[in-house]
Amino acid sequence: MIALGIEGTAHTLGIGIVTEKKVLANVFDTLTTEKGGIHPKEAAEHHARLLKPLLRKALDEAGITIEDVDMIAFSQGPGLGPSLRVVATAARALAIKHNKPIIGVNHCIAHVEIAKMFGVKDPVGLYVSGGNTQVLALEGGRYRVFGETLDIGIGNAIDTFAREIGIGFPGGPKIEKLALEGEKYIELPYAVKGMDLSFSGILTEAVRKYRTGRYRVEDLAYSFQETAFAALVEVTERAVAHTGKDEVVLVGGVAANNRLREMLRIMTEDRGIKFFVPPYDLCRDNGAMIAYTGLRMYLGGVKFNLEETVVKQKFRTDEVEVVWS
């Protein structure tokens, strides 16, 4: 079977086409602003403007027509309301016009599910992006969130720090490069609260220290990464210990960071378990993960009528009964 998936929870519009074992196309376009941040109305306008050309590009890349597609999947949430509505409307229109079944997909679950295309079975997932930071795993037929940020996502924290020190957006790659030149660890707040995390304190203190002019920016970048990533690894390891699972998967835009990968690799090697990171174009927000998860849901017997395709801005992973795994 062939599935087409549309992703549009935030500032990236993605369209993916997959089979059960292969990505046939995975194209996207991201709205970028000079200072970073996302205005929901602008993101929605971006998605509406680019949907048709991106759909054509995906179909051309896959070498198929829309009639060859067996089902349509779309990101139902969580995310920005205006962006989600553009994507849902487009998915409904395609499904109705071409008489295809439609499936609404939880964006966070899709980030973990795409790893299963590569042989991952039942992992603890660390999902780290601009707006989301979660440790989740399948337990009792639902994806349970074992730990998450209580304030801002790790990606937003890094981007905000980068903006405050004047190196622009996106900040992730620039902070990572600066951190490689760090020589001294500077103490910053380490905020793990039970199984949850907080990044506002480390961000505020790192910016405060920078403004004093007494610290090298390279050392601050290094210390920011070491402190924040150690907290992420700690909560992930706790989830592994609690669930007894023997796989960890790293997903989301921040999965591109090599230091975070290294720290997780060390932890998993120490525990004698597997560690996997999907190709980066499948880690970031993308349509292929939506298509793949929607296809797995459909093959597992999940059915949607049009009334069930309303968007869910606060869509929790544990709202979804996982009958397809």
Swiss-Prot record:
One of its GO terms (cellular component) is cytoplasm. Keywords: Acyltransferase, Cytoplasm, Iron, Metal-binding, Transferase, tRNA processing. It is found in: Cytoplasm. It catalyses: L-threonylcarbamoyladenylate + adenosine(37) in tRNA = N(6)-L-threonylcarbamoyladenosine(37) in tRNA + AMP + H(+). Binds 1 Fe(2+) ion per subunit. Its EC number is 2.3.1.234. Substrate binds at Y127, V128, S129, G130, G131, D159, G172, E176, N257. It is an enzyme of class 2 (transferase). PROSITE patterns: GLYCOPROTEASE. GO terms for molecular function: iron ion binding; N(6)-L-threonylcarbamoyladenine synthase activity. The keyword Metal-binding applies. Its cofactor is Fe(2+). Pfam families: TsaD. Its main location: cytoplasm. HAMAP family: Kae1 (MF_01446). Monomer. Component of the KEOPS complex that consists of Kae1, Bud32, Cgi121 and Pcc1; the whole complex dimerizes. NCBIfam families: arch_KAE1, gcp_kae1, PRK09605.1. Belongs to the KAE1 / TsaD family. This is tRNA N6-adenosine threonylcarbamoyltransferase. The gene is kae1.
